[in-house]
From Swiss-Prot:
Subcellular location, principal: cytoplasm
Family matches, as SUPFAM superfamilies: Glyceraldehyde-3-phosphate dehydrogenase-like, C-terminal domain, NAD(P)-binding Rossmann-fold domains
Record's catalysed reaction(s): D-glyceraldehyde 3-phosphate + phosphate + NAD(+) = (2R)-3-phospho-glyceroyl phosphate + NADH + H(+)
InterPro entries listed in its UniProt record: GlycerAld/Erythrose_P_DH, GlycerAld_3-P_DH_AS, GlycerAld_3-P_DH_cat, GlycerAld_3-P_DH_NAD(P)-bd, Glyceraldehyde-3-P_DH_1, NAD(P)-bd_dom_sf
Cell location: Cytoplasm
Binding site for D-glyceraldehyde 3-phosphate: S147, C148, T149, T178, T207, G208, R230
Listed name of the protein: Glyceraldehyde-3-phosphate dehydrogenase
Cross-referenced PROSITE patterns: GAPDH
Complex and partners: Homotetramer.
């Protein structure tokens, strides 16, 4: 089935790159703020992930990538986007604005059949690849791919809980800057700290990522919460999860469980490394979460801290496509 992308920002553009790399068919892009000519430029040149390796051009009022024609719309309101004109049925809602079932459902007016919100949602069912995809059913029309941080945390929490039982835990994500932040101090009425210069500061921030794990792994509901520090790096973030466990274990036991999961049921979603890595080593890594065996610590047999990396842009965008593929498989069955 054909895919449409609403919002051609960091995630929208990388979802298109991800789609092209695995043969998923994107037929339309909507963005009211980006003219076609500028779309070509923005898609081709990326300061973080490099110049796009294929061919990008505009032709007959369309965006053409590697010979594939993508229809471009510039509508402000989702209900005005004529998705059916381009044959787009599965929509990636990556504006960051229409994150509830009601708001995202506006896409159906233009002929869309399903919507994946590329952000957490207050009411849409949330999915994390490798964790709860089996809960998806045909009758769901608007779903959420959760957040990049939830996608990093959930696989790690799943492995810990299934093997050693999480009693309770606190998460900190040391998170790269995103587009909502300011280059220098500026107005940010809802989040005063968030309005401070992104390149000059370590900025404490809130995140719903840990609580959201309770939505995708119901047994952990109410057992995890967390916060974030925004730091002056352009991409790649890291989750630090401190947990009290119900079963006694050694840190080596935890490493073994993570390694086994990364090579088995969670392959492609959870990675494992014993190397002396730093954040930039993960730019362009398409896994959701890469467990850092050397960085974790243990205080007692039931009290540990685990560390896991993620490319918050690229890995997450790959998951959006993975979720779409799963939905299409279930929907066509």
């Amino acid at each position: 089935s054909k895919i449409g992308i609403n919002g051609f920002g960091r995630i929208g553009r990388l979802v298109l790159r991800a789609a092209l790399s695995c043969g998923a068919q994107v037929v339309a892009v909507n963005d009211p703020f980006i003219a076609l000519e500028y779309m070509v430029y923005m898609f081709k040149y990326d300061s973080t992930h490099g110049v796009f390796k294929g061919e990008v051009k505009m032709e007959d009022g369309a965006l053409v990538v590697d010979g594939k024609k993508i229809t471009v719309f510039n509508e402000m309101k989702p209900e005005n986007i004529p998705w059916s004109k381009a044959g787009a049925e599965y929509i990636v809602e990556s504006t960051g604005v229409f994150t509830t079932i009601e708001k995202a459902s506006a896409h159906f007016k233009g002929g869309a059949k399903k919507v994946v919100i590329s952000a957490p949602s207050a009411d849409a069912p949330m999915f994390v690849c490798g964790v709860n995809l089996e809960k998806y059913s045909k009758d769901m029309t608007v779903v959420s791919n959760a957040s990049c941080t939830t996608n990093c945390l959930a696989p790690v929490a799943k492995v810990l809980h299934e093997n050693f039982e999480i009693v309770e835990g606190l998460m900190t994500t040391v998170h790269a800057v995103t587009a909502t932040q300011k280059t220098v101090d500026g107005p940010s009425a809802k989040d005063w700290r968030g309005g401070r210069g992104a390149a000059q500061n370590i900025i404490p921030s809130s995140t719903g990522a840990a609580k959201a794990v309770g939505k995708v792994i119901p047994e952990l509901d109410g057992k995890l919460t967390g916060m974030a520090f925004r730091v002056p790096t352009p991409d790649v973030s890291v989750v630090d999860l401190t947990v009290r466990l119900g079963k006694e274990c050694s840190y080596d036991d935890i490493k073994a469980a993570m390694k086994t999961a990364s090579e088995g049921p969670l392959q492609g979603f959870l990675g494992y490394t014993e190397d002396d890595v730093v954040s930039s080593d993960f730019i362009g890594d398409n896994r959701s979460s890469i467990f850092d065996a050397k960085a974790g610590i243990q205080l007692s047999k039931t009290f540990v801290k685990v560390v896991s990396w993620y490319d918050n842009e690229f890995g997450y965008s790959q998951r959006v496509i993975d979720l779409l593929k799963h939905m299409q498989k279930v929907d066509s069955a």
